[in-house]
């Protein structure tokens, strides 16, 4: 790896939200510019408007193409050339279009290898459209532009928890039908590979959550654990993936068991997001796994209710910047090691100690817990 600073593309998000406030506050600290070269894909006029309206201490240089970005400063790339009306705190079609145009330009520039990592400010999917089609979120858009048919995985990343979900946003009544052995194996395998490559953990342990509140034979509320989830865990073990479970979510998080694992695979969206938000208190990051581009985002909304008030907390956005830098370094080192492997001097001996350690404890039939 060379000593050149990481080139970080940053999309401005919904122009009526808190995107520019987060960006300018994050890079107000000079040491942030020592870590990377930020290239903000946005509108120079909108950026200047927010800087003046909130008296933000931000200096930026306007550029027309990413190749012109220089180290030691905020580079504002004019991805949105037309006039954009700013109406702080109000989601409009115009503000949504500006968000998508910045992201689209960033996708084009990544194909041309003009930056290393991508950090996105929040977008509102309800007012973002692409030539008449609804915007389904950053992950879906990146899959469409760069995935070449592959599907990504959204991982919520905090200080003590990484969690992903087998299914995406669905009505709860449809979740069970969408959970299959194949899907669990696919998501868990990608999760494990991502933790190894992008988070520098050589042999990650994955906890798999149960779908139903109770999952032992006597008190189970459903058959999905026995018929789908446990067979999937067994198949993962055969592939060399350290997957354990299934664990009922209430006890798993209530007892702090998540701290024993490198990743947690939930069955549905809210089973992942509810404990994550409670544990991370607004400082969490969304990581898009399985795509060529390293993309992170603060796990927050566009913040219309506080837009323009200069009260937005940039902690999660700064964490997204840090995570993008860390994962780029880890991925680069991992890929370099894979391209130039050292000869193996010994072979690892596997045993069942880990499997025993993380096994679900059997409850006695007459115990109070078994009767609940």
Identify the meaning behind each predicted range.
Residues 171-176, 302-306:
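Intrinsically disordered or low-complexity boundary/linker segments at protein termini
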Residues 145-161, 289-305:
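Short, flexible loop segments at boundaries between secondary-structure elements
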Residues 123-126, 160-161, 169-172:
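Short acidic/polar capping segments at secondary-structure boundaries
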Residues 1-138, 185-267, 271-278, 282-284, ...:
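Contiguous, glycine/small-aliphatic-enriched amphipathic segments in soluble metabolic enzymes
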């Amino acid at each position: 790896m060379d000593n050149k600073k990481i080139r970080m593309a940053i999309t401005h998000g919904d122009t009526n939200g808190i995107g520019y406030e987060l960006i300018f506050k994050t890079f107000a600290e000079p040491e942030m510019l020592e870590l990377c070269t930020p290239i903000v894909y946005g509108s120079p006029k909108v950026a200047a408007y927010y800087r003046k309206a909130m008296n933000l201490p931000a200096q930026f240089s306007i550029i027309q193409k990413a190749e012109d970005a220089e180290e030691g400063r905020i580079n504002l790339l004019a991805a949105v050339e037309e006039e954009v009306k700013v109406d702080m705190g109000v989601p409009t079609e115009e503000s949504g279009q500006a968000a998508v145009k910045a992201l689209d330009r960033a996708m084009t520039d990544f194909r041309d290898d003009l930056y290393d990592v991508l950090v996105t400010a929040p977008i509102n999917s309800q007012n973002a459209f692409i030539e008449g089609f609804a915007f389904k979120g950053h992950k879906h858009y990146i899959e469409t532009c760069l995935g070449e048919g592959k599907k990504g995985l959204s991982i919520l990343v905090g200080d003590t928890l990484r969690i992903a979900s087998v299914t995406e946003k669905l009505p709860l009544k449809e979740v069970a039908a969408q959970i299959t052995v194949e899907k669990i194996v696919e998501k868990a395998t990608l999760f494990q590979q991502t933790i190894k490559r992008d988070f520098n953990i050589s042999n990650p342990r994955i906890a798999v959550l149960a779908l139903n509140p109770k999952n032992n034979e006597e008190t189970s509320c459903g058959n999905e654990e026995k018929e789908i989830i446990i067979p999937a865990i067994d198949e993962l073990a055969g592939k060399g993936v350290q997957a354990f479970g299934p664990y009922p979510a209430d006890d798993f998080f209530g007892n702090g068991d998540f701290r024993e694992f490198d990743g947690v695979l939930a069955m549905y969206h809210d089973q992942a997001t509810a404990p994550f938000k409670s544990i991370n208190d607004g400082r969490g990051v969304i990581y898009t796994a399985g795509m060529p581009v390293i993309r992170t985002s603060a796990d927050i909304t566009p913040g219309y209710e506080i837009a323009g008030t200069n009260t937005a907390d940039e902690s999660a956005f700064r964490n997204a910047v840090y995570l993008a830098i860390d994962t780029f370094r880890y991925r680069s080192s991992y890929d370099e090691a894979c391209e130039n492997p050292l000869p193996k001097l010994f072979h690892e001996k596997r045993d069942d100690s880990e499997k025993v350690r993380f096994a679900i404890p059997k409850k006695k039939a007459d115990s109070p817990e078994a009767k609940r």
